[in-house]
Swiss-Prot record:
Pfam families: Iso_dh. Its EC number is 1.1.1.85. PROSITE patterns: IDH_IMDH (PS00470). GO terms for cellular component: cytosol. The record marks Y141, K190 as: Important for catalysis. One of its GO terms (biological process) is L-leucine biosynthetic process. It comes from Rhodopirellula baltica (strain DSM 10527 / NCIMB 13988 / SH1). The keyword ATP-binding does not apply. Keywords: Amino-acid biosynthesis, Branched-chain amino acid biosynthesis, Cytoplasm, Leucine biosynthesis, Magnesium, Manganese, Metal-binding, NAD, Oxidoreductase. Its cofactor is Mg(2+); Mn(2+). The lineage of its organism: Bacteria, Pseudomonadati, Planctomycetota, Planctomycetia, Pirellulales. This is 3-isopropylmalate dehydrogenase. InterPro entries: IsoCit/isopropylmalate_DH_CS (IPR019818), IsoPropMal-DH-like_dom (IPR024084), Isopropylmalate_DH (IPR004429). It is an enzyme of class 1 (oxidoreductase). The keyword Ribonucleoprotein does not apply.
């Protein structure tokens, strides 16, 4: 297979971690007989510095023509001026819109060897392996908003809307993923209070009954789900939910493995290139120090192979290699915790994954 991959290193530690993921992909191409053509483009703060735009047109054009996109991170205190005309994060929002990316996939997987890094007891969190599907382009974040009145009478509002089509496409995508895992799907809503959630629940149930009768399906209210993630996270597999609920629940769930440095994500649409990235930020305080954890970005590259390029065996090879270096006891400082004698650098961790792929 010959595929074009756009790299968007971005700001802070972005260039360091994207480079390690690129080296892993080079090894995958060598091992499995593929050709990956990489091109690097600007996004975020560095793009503002160079062009005045957090997402320059050449970056948009390159992304549209690529098979997939791998992003590092954007933002940092350098660009936090509230009076600035634009911010680095605007580039990320714009690229999602330009590419029509409506589904955010976030796997929450705990490696058994890292159970002691979780804030929860090992017996509660062990075995956690959840894949969240969050709807990205509808819901309250994109509803009509405004204010009226003044003083004590000042009022603000934000409307929450979902269409049948928006619900159908995200539920279908999640159900397809469930078929490739344990055949279980949980939909999260607030149908006891919110009208859009009632539509969500009705449409989701129709899709599951008519198109995925083989998938075990249940529904959970969002407040109950917030509790379940703390007291029994290992009981869930694939979870689908709306924009705001997904935003909150995935941030909560991201704490389960104990480090953001282990968690990748993907943003997908109907065909076209997907966008893959670690969930952590640009961490400017450690940029250039070779201590950033590249594993989330490497795992994002595995997601890219699976979801955009259809290379399941290759994705599994990367995931197996990452599991292998963790089993071997290699830890970047965020994972080593108090025992820094176990810690390795960004480059050493990346090289260890490459070595596993070569063996």
């Amino acid at each position: 297979m010959n595929s074009s991959i756009v790299l968007l290193p971005g700001d802070g530690i972005g260039p360091e971690i994207v480079e390690q993921a690129r080296l892993v992909l080079v090894k995958v191409a060598e091992r499995f007989g593929h050709t990956f053509d990489f091109s690097s483009h600007q996004i975020g703060g560095i793009a503002i510095d160079e062009t005045g735009d957090p997402l320059p047109q050449p970056t948009i054009d390159a992304c549209r023509n690529a098979a997939a996109i791998l992003l590092g991170a954007v933002g940092g205190p350098k660009w936090d001026d509230p009076s600035a005309k634009t911010r680095p994060e605007a580039g990320l929002l714009k690229i999602r819109k330009e590419l029509g990316l409506f589904a955010n996939l976030r796997p929450i997987k705990l490696f058994d060897e890292l159970a002691d890094a979780s804030p929860l007891r090992a017996d509660i969190v062990k075995g956690t392996d959840i894949l969240f599907f969050r709807e990205l382009t509808g819901g309250i974040y994109f509803g009509e908003s405004g204010t009226s009145g003044s003083g004590e009478e000042e009022t603000a509002f934000q409307s929450m809307t979902y269409s049948v089509g928006e619900v159908k496409r995200i539920v279908r995508m999640a159900a397809q993923a469930a078929r490739g895992r344990s055949n279980r799907l949980t939909s999260v809503d607030k149908a006891n209070v919110l009208e859009p959630s009632r539509l969500w629940r009705r449409v989701a149930a129709e899709v599951m009954a008519n198109e995925f009768p083989d998938v075990q399906y249940d529904v959970v209210l969002v407040d109950s789900m917030a509790m379940h993630l703390i007291n029994r996270p290992s009981e869930f597999d694939v979870v689908v939910t709306g924009n705001m609920f997904g935003d909150i629940l995935t941030d909560e769930a991201s704490m389960l493995p104990g480090s953001l440095g282990m968690l990748p994500s993907a943003s997908l649409g109907d065909g076209g290139p997907g966008l893959y990235e670690p969930i952590h930020g640009s961490a400017p305080d450690i940029a250039g120090k070779s201590v950033a954890n590249p594993l989330a970005t490497i795992l994002a590259a595995a997601m890219m192979l699976r979801h955009s390029l259809g290379l399941t065996d290759e994705a599994e090879a990367i995931e197996k290699a990452v599991a292998g270096v963790i089993t071997d006891g290699l830890r970047t400082p965020d994972l080593a915790r108090g025992d820094q004698s176990k810690s390795v650098s960004t480059e050493e961790m990346g090289a260890a994954v490459v070595a596993k792929l070569a063996s």
